[in-house]
Amino acid sequence: MFSKTLVVLAAVAAVTVNGLTAKECQDAFTGEVAKLTTGALPLVQPCSSDSGFSMVPPTGLPTDDQYVKMCASKNCKALLEFIKGAGLKDCELNFGSIFPGSVPLNVYQLGQGFDAKCESISGGGSTPTTAPPSGTTPTTPTTAPPTGTTPGVTPSPTTPKPAC
């Protein structure tokens, strides 16, 4: 547990900017270290085991396959709910100095976009359409537009345009 705490503290020291100044990112994460250490770290390994996504060290954003597994995992849902509620700022954590080959990860964006990503992967979010039951006719008559020409309107000649 001590090594994971050390990793989080080192990551906080390696915050990079995404829309905020480096100082704003540093200040925002410094205040959240204790909450992240005690609340998120116990869920990181179980979520990684469930999904195959490596958050520490990060190797990129989750793939669609990893998101499918994360969206189905109680551990990952709990982790992302905790992250969403932690009050983090929109900044990236850069683990590169600790874990060569890792990439910066914006934990805030990962948390905030999690539910929408799960919906898009599961096909949710679309509004179902309802059709009238088969064998029935609509109760409201429909009127087709008139065919032919409209009185008082003379159609203008058209000239074919050359193909591009």
From Swiss-Prot:
Any one Pfam family here would be: Elicitin
Coiled coil (residue ranges): none
Name the InterPro entries on file.
Elicitin, Elicitin_sf
Instruction: List the keywords (alphabetical).
Output: Disulfide bond, Hypersensitive response elicitation, Secreted, Signal
- Any S-S bridges, and between which cysteines? 25-91, 47-76, 71-118
UniProt biased composition (Low complexity):
127-156
Q: Which stretch is the leader sequence?
A: 1-22
- GO CC annotations? extracellular region
Matching entries from SMART domains are given as:
Elicitin (SM01187)
> Which BP terms in the Gene Ontology apply to this protein?
symbiont-mediated perturbation of host programmed cell death
Localization, per the record, is: Secreted
Its job? Induces local and distal defense responses (incompatible hypersensitive reaction) in plants from the solanaceae and cruciferae families. Elicits leaf necrosis and causes the accumulation of pathogenesis-related proteins. Might interact with the lipidic molecules of the plasma membrane.
- What does the similarity note say? Belongs to the elicitin family.
- Protein's name according to its UniProt entry: Elicitin-like protein 2
Q: Which organism is it from?
A: Pythium oligandrum (Mycoparasitic fungus)
Underlying gene: POD-2
